[in-house]
Structures are given as structure tokens and as C-alpha cells.
Amino acid sequence: MPSPIPFNSFLPLELSPSADLRPCSSPVVIPGKDGKAFLGGTPSPRTRRLPPRLAWCSIDWDRLCLLQPLGSGGFGAVYKATYHGVTVAVKQVKKSSKNRLASRQSFWAELNVARLQHDNVVRVVAASTCAPASQNSLGTIIMEYVGNVTLHHVIYGTRDAWRQGEEEEGGCGRKALSMAEAVCYSCDIVTGLAFLHSQGIVHLDLKPANILITEHGACKIGDFGCSQRLEEGLSQSHHVCQQGGTYTHRAPELLKGERVTAKADIYSFAITLWQIVMREQPYLGERQYVLYAVVAYNLRPPLAAAIFHESAVGQRLRSIISCCWKADVEERLSAAQLLPSLRALKENL
């Protein structure tokens, strides 16, 4: 069996408790006609403040109004809302009764992309460690609103908006993706990764469910709850990878407890690209079997399907996937190295 994924009890030094430069009171949730409005309340004496470097993104609670829930899970809940009159998405990270440290790390990891702006990355607008007193919340993060359709929905046809017209085409509940769409999505994802890696950020949970699709069909990478920031000037983190992420997309070196590098995201991209082309789940076996086989026997999803051989584009994508999920980290291409070939492929479609 592969080595268990190490769990480290640490938080980055710059995220240690510090006085915020702006007032941030614990809000009160008041039901409204069209939603719920956050209003300032009495600050909790135990509330942690954002560190000075993040004080710019403190939340103006009286300008935030929740409209409707978009989804929920073990991390907490996401709402559609308005902030200063602009439509946004609000994530409320809940405290985990089983693992509070993991909840805290996830919240602070989300802020790794604070102040970064890129067309293929979901932008953080504001954040606060304050939360409604009635909720078991660790903090609140306001992000740009991209929509509620992910690449997972597009691939597997699990969102009604992407299933219209399929019955007329004789489909089986999902609309086929063209090679052109596969290349365009891949180009967007790698462009976003190249930007993140240039900023010293490794996502560590790249998969279709964490890639949002805009109304114009562009991809934006989101959900940075597992991300890590590499030390300036270094190509790898001095920390081994923490628990978290999705085992089907997790690079073998991380499963073995080795150091984090940006190449871990490239491995995850390869699995994601395979899903875009094949529209199947990468592995169907038991979790522990898959973990063992990926590390010990270089198990990967199959590339024998006709779609990878019938056209020049399919053959090129097969070559890219093969290169990106190599077991040896050094043999994988970087996002910056991948971009030229993907862009050339896109231009020649």
C-alpha cells in the first residue's frame, strides 16, 4: 500500500492571528423579502481577524444580501448574493466537528488567490473571519459570480441547462462534446494554471467539479480550499502535502507523501483532459486498490479508444495526456510549456 498521506498541524506564519486594519463585526442574518441581508452586530471577543496583508478585502456587511443557495457540502454552503449591487457568490465555511484544523486550513487556503485577477481564475472579492452568530461558521468568502455550471456538469450532463435539445438529437441524456470544445476547455484550464503557478500557487484539487463554465463557455478555476503557496524562488513547497483533494486526480508523488510542486496540478489536468475527451469516470475500482495501483503499477485511465487515434487532434491530445501524467515529476511538462501546443491546436481547428 502507498504511504498514508501525511497530515501536518500547521498554518502559514502570515496567517497567524493578527489585528485587522478595518472593523469587522459579527453579522446578524435578517430574513428579507427577496433573501437574507447581513447587518453588523456585536463583535465576538474570540473572533480572529484577517492579517494586515488581507485587510483590503474585509467585508462591508451592510452591503451584502444573500439571494438563494447554490450548493452545500462538508465545507459549508455557497449562496448567490449581491454585494454593493453586484451579483456575487458567497461561501460560508463551516467548522468541522471532526477536524477543525482542516476547516481552518481550507478557509485560509481559499485566500491564496486574494487580489489575483485572471480571466481563467475565480476572483476573491472580499473575506472575513466573522460570520452570523447563529451559524457554526469559520468565515465568509465573497467571490465573483460565474454561474452554477461546472465542467463536470458539461461532461456528464448533470445540469439541465446543458441537456436542452438532446432528446431531439437522439442522445442518451447528455450532449456530446466536440474535439474543438475539448481543446478550448483545455486551453483555458492550462492558461489559468500557468498564471497560478507563475504566482507561486498550486491548486492541488483540480478536477471538472472545480472548474466553472461562464455563460460564454470559458473555464474558470475555482475552489482553492486545498491550495498551497510555494515559497518565493522555489519550485516546490517545503511542506509535504496535507490531506484533502480527490484521490482519482491526485498525483502519485502526493499519494506517497512527497513534496508539493506545480507538476501535481499537471497530473490532475491530464486526468481532467481524459474525462473531457472520454466522458467517463477515470477509475471504477475500490479506492484503496486505485491508490495502490496508481503508485505501484502506474495505473492510468486507458488511451486505447478510437477517439484518440482517428484524428490528428485526438492523437495530439493523447500525446499531451501521456506526457502530463507520467510518474516521474521531472518528465511532465509545465503549464507554460503546454500552452504553445494547445494554442496552436486551437488555432488550427
Curated annotation (Swiss-Prot):
Q: Where is the Protein kinase domain?
A: 64-345
Where is it localised?
Answer: Cytoplasm
**Keyword annotations for this protein?**
ATP-binding, Cytoplasm, Kinase, Nucleotide-binding, Serine/threonine-protein kinase, Transferase
Q: What is its main location?
A: cytoplasm
Top-level taxon:
Eukaryota
> Which BP terms in the Gene Ontology apply to this protein?
MAPK cascade; negative regulation of metaphase/anaphase transition of meiotic cell cycle; positive regulation of MAPK cascade; protein autophosphorylation; signal transduction
Q: Name one molecular function that GO assigns to this entry.
A: protein kinase activity
Q: Which reaction does it catalyse?
A: L-seryl-[protein] + ATP = O-phospho-L-seryl-[protein] + ADP + H(+); L-threonyl-[protein] + ATP = O-phospho-L-threonyl-[protein] + ADP + H(+)
Is Cytoplasm there in the keyword field? yes
The record's section on SMART domains has: S_TKc
Active-site residues from the entry: 205
Give the enzyme's EC designation.
2.7.11.1
GO-annotated cellular components? cytoplasm
For ATP, which residues are the binding ones?
70-78, 91
Q: Name one Pfam family in it.
A: Pkinase
What family does this belong to?
Belongs to the protein kinase superfamily. Ser/Thr protein kinase family.
Task: Say what the protein does.
Answer: Serine/threonine kinase involved in the regulation of MAPK signaling.
Please give the PANTHER family that the UniProt record associates with this protein: SERINE/THREONINE-PROTEIN KINASE TNNI3K-RELATED, V-MOS MOLONEY MURINE SARCOMA VIRAL ONCO HOMOLOG
Q: This protein is called what?
A: Serine/threonine-protein kinase mos
Q: Which organism is it from?
A: Gallus gallus (Chicken)
> What does the record give as the organism's lineage?
Eukaryota, Metazoa, Chordata, Craniata, Vertebrata
What gene is behind this protein?
A: MOS
